[in-house]
């Protein structure tokens, strides 16, 4: 009879009471967002017309390391937290690796992903301020599903702009959003000025997160008592996601180990930051030697092949200018099935950390990600979301290095969600119909060159 522990479970009483703000401990703080017209730094109050005031304050807070989690949000967290930390014995055996592989299983949330951690917080702060309507964008639909759940929980009306290619590829996520009462529109659409402009110039545009953000912001700015919310990129979103890593810290203690490597897939940064930043505070404050690896799709390689500079967070240029690693806000990503990772830029915190060489980034081809996802499903019994497959692929790469070197390193990655509503993507993979998309240096150079107009 085996005495090995597979899952490490914290009781409900151990749900964290505070989120961790890594900016307070960073040696170089992220540069400020700028007003596009004046190029002057923004204050939190400048963001109040778009975001709930508490969220704008969190966005600009670079001094307080800990932010209290409201009781109302913690009560909602009790529906699914604490989430399990799992030792991937099956994957280890299949790889023949001496590495110890752990994953934080965020797929157990009511909507199947980590996105609910911030959705509940953002909906709460909007409700507390007296807001009645909120808008958002969504790529693969994970964020839209989470926010639709949260909006219903706190009595808010929600309008979602869903990237067109995902709207078509993932109809059941659209159904989930509509089940919770959200209005869902394929983006780009004819319902906004930004959408109409893009469709006039590119009638067959398949959509991007940058485009959907533009439409959601435009609707929020033109609707009374309405605020915009978003699922990644900005610092307050990543703040809420640190509940993942804070729980994982305690669970790794239960396992009697500490990670040598921490891996998260990367679209805008909230998932990666959520698992890694609570551990990173020990690197920043105590010099703890841990590697932090962001795994992005090679078809959208903002961290590995982009440039660090100020850029808009959306295609139409409605957002402030943000200091980020970017491929250019006009970048049109390939129609990969990891819809949640199809974004042109990186969040300001991750961008600064990468610039300071406190973390690493790798790019993963689409087929390699699905290879890893299927291996994980076959060995651990969970079909991962296509986005999470990128983190698994990066973990597999590192585990194979351990096989070659004989080093028993401890690897931790975040399984951000399950893929049970992404089976059309797996169908195409299994039929041999998926391909890799690679960008030429010339394509990237041309797109980044358009940023010169920003100044």
List where the protein language model places each region.
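Alpha-helix C-terminal capping segments
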Residues: 121-131, 145-157, 178-179, 276-286, ...
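A short, small-residue-rich loop immediately preceding and capping a beta-strand
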Residues: 118, 126-165, 258-272, 292, ...
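Active-site nucleophile and cofactor-binding loops and adjacent substrate-binding regions
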Residues: 105-116, 134-143, 234-237, 263-268, ...
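Positively charged, low-complexity intrinsically disordered leader regions
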Residues: 3-131
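Claisen-condensing/thiolase-fold acyl-transfer catalytic domains that form or cleave C-C bonds
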Residues: 266-274, 366-424, 428-432
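Active-site/ligand-binding loops adjacent to catalytic centers
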Residues: 66-68, 197-236, 244, 255-256, ...
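Active-site-proximal loop->helix
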Residues: 143-206, 302-315, 423-431
């Amino acid at each position: 009879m085996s005495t090995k522990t597979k899952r490490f479970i914290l009781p409900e009483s151990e749900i964290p009471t505070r989120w961790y703000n890594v900016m307070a401990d960073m040696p170089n703080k992220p540069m400020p967002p700028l007003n596009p017209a004046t190029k002057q730094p923004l204050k939190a109050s400048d963001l109040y017309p778009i975001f709930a005031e508490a969220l704008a304050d969190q966005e600009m807070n670079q001094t307080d390391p800990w932010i209290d989690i409201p009781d109302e949000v913690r009560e909602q967290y009790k529906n699914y937290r604490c989430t399990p930390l799992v030792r991937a014995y099956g994957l280890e055996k299949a790889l023949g690796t001496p590495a110890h592989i752990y994953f934080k299983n965020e797929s157990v949330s009511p909507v199947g992903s980590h996105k609910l951690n911030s959705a509940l917080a953002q909906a709460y702060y909007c409700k507390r301020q007296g807001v009645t309507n909120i808008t958002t964008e969504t790529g693969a639909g994970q964020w839209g599903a989470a926010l639709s759940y949260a909006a219903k929980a706190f009595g808010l009306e929600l309008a979602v702009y869903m990237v067109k290619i995902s709207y078509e590829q993932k109809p059941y996520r659209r159904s989930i959003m509509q089940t919770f009462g959200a209005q869902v529109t394929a983006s780009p659409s004819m319902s906004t000025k930004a959408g109409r402009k893009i469709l006039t110039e590119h009638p067959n545009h398949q959509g991007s997160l940058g485009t959907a953000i533009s439409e959601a912001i435009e609707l929020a700015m033109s609707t009374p008592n309405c605020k915009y919310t978003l699922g990644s990129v900005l610092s307050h979103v990543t703040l809420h996601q640190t509940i993942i890593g804070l729980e994982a810290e305690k669970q790794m203690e239960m396992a009697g180990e500490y990670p040598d490597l921490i891996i998260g897939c990367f679209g805008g940064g909230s998932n990666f930051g959520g698992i890694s930043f609570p551990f990173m505070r020990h690197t920043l404050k105590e010099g703890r030697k841990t590697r932090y690896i962001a795994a992005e799709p090679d078809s959208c390689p903002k961290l590995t092949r982009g440039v660090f500079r100020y850029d808009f967070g959306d295609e139409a240029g409605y957002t402030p200018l943000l200091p980020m690693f970017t491929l250019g806000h006009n970048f049109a990503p390939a129609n990969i099935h990891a819809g949640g990772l199809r974004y042109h830029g990186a969040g300001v915190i991750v961008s600064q950390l990468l610039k300071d060489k406190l973390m690493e980034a790798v790019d993963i081809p689409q087929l390699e990600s699905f290879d890893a996802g299927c291996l994980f499903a076959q060995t651990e019994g969970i079909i991962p979301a296509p986005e999470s497959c990128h983190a698994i692929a990066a973990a597999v790469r590192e585990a194979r290095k351990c096989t070659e070197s004989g080093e028993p390193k401890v690897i931790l990655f975040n399984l951000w969600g399950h893929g049970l509503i992404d089976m059309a993507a797996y169908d195409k993979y299994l039929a041999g119909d998926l391909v890799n998309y690679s960008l030429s240096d010339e394509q990237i150079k041309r797109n980044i060159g358009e940023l010169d107009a920003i100044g």
